[in-house]
Every structure is written in C-alpha cells, then in structure tokens.
C-alpha cells in the first residue's frame, strides 16, 4: 500500500507557475500515484482519458506567455455525484451507469477556468453495487466514512492534491476525519450545486453543499475563493461577499466548545484534542466563551424526519410540523451561539471503526451545522492508536472566513 500522506498544493502551484515543472509531467506522475492509491483503497470510479491533452494545452499557453489561472496545472479529483463533461456521473447507482453529462457542474467549470485538471472521478458510499467497498488509506480494515469516502481516500492516501465532494449530513466531514484530511462544508448558499447529481428536488435540497478536501486548511480557503458565488442557475446561492480568512484576527475571537454528552460520549482522545485546540486558540488571544449545547437529541429527531420526508415517508401535516421544528432548532442555535464566534466540537464519536455500514450515530456531531447551514471546517489534529483524530470548527452562517482562520490556527499548533 502507498504511504498515506496527503499532498499540499501550495508548493506545486509555485513550481508550475515558475515553469520549474510542466503540467503534463505533474499529471502523468499524479495519475500513477492515484493508481497505486486506488489499488489499495478502490477510490476511483472513472479516469479522465483527456487529462494529459488538457495538461499539454495548459503548457502550450504558458510557453506562449498566455495568462494562467490560480490552480494552473493542478491535478484534482471529483466525487461521482458532481458532473464533469464527458465523464460518467452515476451517483453510485447502477441504474445510471451509462449516464455521461455534456456540461460541467458550476464548481468544476470554475476549477477548470482556474487551470485545474480533473484526472479522475471518485467512488461514493462505503459499499457500492457498482464498485464494491472503498477502503481507508490509513488502515484498509477501517471505514473511510460516508458518501465522499472515495475523495477522502484519494486525498488522504496522497493520490490527489485536491478533492471536490459534497455534504448533506456529514458526507465531507466524517470521511475527512477518518482519513486524516481537512475539509470545509461551506455556509449554505455560498457555493452553487448546479450539476450535482441527484438534482435539487429529487434527493437533494438546501442541506447539500459542495466543498473541497485537501491536506491543509489554506488550500480549502484558496479553493473556496474560486468556487463560491452565484451562477445564475442555483437560486439558493446569495451574492454575499466572501471575506478573506487572512484578515481575521484570532485574538479576541470568542471560542465555545462541546465535548460530547451522556447520550453521545466521545473517546478520551477526542475530548483531549478539543480541549487542546481551545487552549491553543486561547494562547493566541482568543477568549473562552464556555460550553455550548448543540441539542443533539433534537438535531437527531429533525434529521430522522428529514430522511423520511426526502424518501416520501412523511406527508401532509407531518411535513409542515417537521419544517416548523427545523426552523425552531435554527433559532435556538442562533441564540445558543450568540455569545461566541466559533464552536470547537467533535466530528465523530471515535476514530474510524472497522469496515461496516454507516450508522446514524456516525453523523450525530455533523447534524447541527447541516441543519443550521453554518460553515464547518474539519482539521486533523493528531492520532489515537495510529488512526487520525480531527476536530470540527463551526462558525456563524456566512462567516466561513472565521471558521477557516480558526481552523488554520489549530492546524498550525498541531
């Protein structure tokens, strides 16, 4: 099995931008790395046969002195729920195995315009009728997480510099935590989901957000600046300016925390990691804001009814009651978070379990930010028995910049 070491994109961008290495060479080498990771994890759903020719076109433009984008020549992978023109997009469903979109999803088009090159689509779900089981790059006997598991395995195994996945209830955050990579679930309404399959109104609604997975929080911030903003199609995306995380001062930030509760207890290693992260922020001048209760039992009840509604098993007055309870939960969380800027909390109850189907409790700590639409960053902070540990940094809606800056500070101290 290849060494499971996520690759940071910053140095690569510098080398490509200065002509020290060609995009073709980078793409060829990265495809070989990804093949090794795929052999170990089963993370690839489809390969892009045009990747080298796309890289050659970028090299020709660079040689001619033409403009290059901020991700010039960077090889990336994309979850097989997100359209890439000319490549299969099945959503992991055997009924759609022959579906090949003719246009890119908005986020993919923006990444292409920035110079990125899609080298592969990645598998979804832990187990799939189309592809079989996805394995964790750290330990193949362990689960890689939820539906963005192929992306997390590709990035966590060092097969991809940057992954693009999606998250409705934790599908970016749980795989990232278990595979040892950073990720961002952006604020609801920040990034268009045009070109996400299944479509809005089928099995996807306003909880679903597209976001990046990478080796570092800095790369997440770089990519968010590229993919965010209205596209004239997704009516759920608002023209809210994206503030620069680098402009956020950690000193003075009010930090809340949650360690778990009696109903959903976390392991000692995870509780210690959260306490350490909070202490690191306080050492930089952040202010202790106290413990925050995310009302997990309430979040679980609303989420379970959401799943029933999305599958047509909730009708009539029950649907209206569910939506009213969801609104009340959002209001309660606004009041609970009023005295803090961020909350540092667990991503999961424990480190990656032995390979199994996902359980509802695996998502318990990711449910609150999914229901409120708040931005949430997952940042790896260490290991317990050689398995990755991560913490989740949740900020107020639209304050992706604060979540990213605080997570970067935690990352730097880890």
Predicted regions and their residues:
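An N-terminal boundary/leader segment
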Residues: 1-53, 282-283
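Short, well-ordered beta-strand elements within core beta-sheets of diverse protein domains
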Residues: 12-18, 95-99, 208-215, 393-394
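Glycine-rich, small-residue loops and helix-cap segments
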Residues: 19, 30, 73, 79, ...
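Structural helix-boundary/capping segments
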Residues: 36, 156-256, 275-284, 371-414
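Short glycine/serine-rich loop/turn segments
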Residues: 37, 71-210, 260, 312-313, ...
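Long amphipathic alpha-helix in the N-terminal Rossmann-like dinucleotide-binding domain
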Residues: 51-56, 115-116
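Short helix-loop capping/hinge segments that flank enzyme active sites or metal/cofactor-binding pockets
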Residues: 71-91, 249-258, 279-339, 380-390
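Hydrophobic/aromatic ligand-binding patch that stacks against planar heteroaromatic rings
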Residues: 110, 152-154, 280, 367-370
């Amino acid at each position: 099995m290849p060494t499971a070491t996520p690759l940071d994109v910053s140095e690569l961008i510098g080398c490509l931008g200065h002509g020290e290495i060609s995009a073709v060479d980078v793409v060829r080498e990265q495809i070989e790395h990804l093949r090794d990771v795929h052999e170990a994890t089963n993370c690839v759903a489809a390969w892009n046969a045009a990747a080298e020719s796309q890289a050659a076109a970028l090299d020709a433009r660079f040689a001619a002195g033409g403009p290059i984008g901020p991700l010039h020549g960077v090889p990336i992978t994309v979850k097989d729920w997100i359209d890439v023109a000319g490549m299969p997009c099945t959503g992991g469903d055997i009924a759609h195995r022959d579906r090949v979109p003719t246009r890119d999803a908005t986020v993919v088009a923006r990444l292409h315009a920035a110079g990125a090159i899609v080298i592969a689509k990645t598998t979804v779900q832990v187990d799939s009728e189309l592809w079989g089981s996805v394995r964790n790059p750290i330990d193949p006997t362990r689960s890689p997480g939820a539906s963005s598991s192929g992306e997390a395995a590709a990035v966590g195994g060092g097969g991809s510099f940057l992954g693009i996945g999606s998250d409705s209830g934790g599908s970016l955050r749980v795989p990232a935590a278990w595979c040892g990579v950073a990720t961002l679930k952006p604020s609801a309404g920040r990034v268009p989901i045009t070109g996400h399959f299944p479509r809005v109104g089928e099995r996807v609604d306003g909880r679903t957000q597209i976001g990046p997975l990478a080796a570092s929080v800095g790369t997440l911030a770089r990519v968010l600046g590229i993919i965010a903003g209205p596209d004239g199609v997704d009516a759920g995306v608002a023209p809210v300016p994206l503030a620069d995380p680098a402009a956020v001062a950690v000193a003075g930030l009010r930090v809340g925390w949650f360690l778990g509760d009696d109903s959903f207890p976390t392991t000692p290693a995870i509780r210690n990691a959260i306490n350490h992260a909070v202490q690191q922020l306080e050492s930089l001048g952040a202010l202790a804001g106290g413990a925050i209760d995310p009302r997990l039992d309430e979040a679980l009840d609303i989420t379970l009814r959401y799943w029933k509604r999305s599958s047509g098993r909730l009708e009539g007055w029950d649907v209206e009651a569910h939506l009213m309870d969801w609104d009340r939960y959002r209001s309660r969380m606004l009041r609970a978070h009023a005295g803090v800027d961020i909350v540092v909390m667990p991503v999961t109850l424990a480190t990656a379990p032995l390979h199994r189907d996902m359980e509802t409790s695996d998502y318990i700590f990711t449910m609150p930010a999914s229901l409120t639409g708040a931005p949430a960053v997952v940042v790896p902070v260490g290991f317990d028995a050689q398995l990755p540990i991560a913490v989740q940094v949740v900020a107020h809606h639209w304050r992706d910049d604060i979540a990213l800056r605080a997570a970067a500070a935690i990352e730097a101290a880890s």
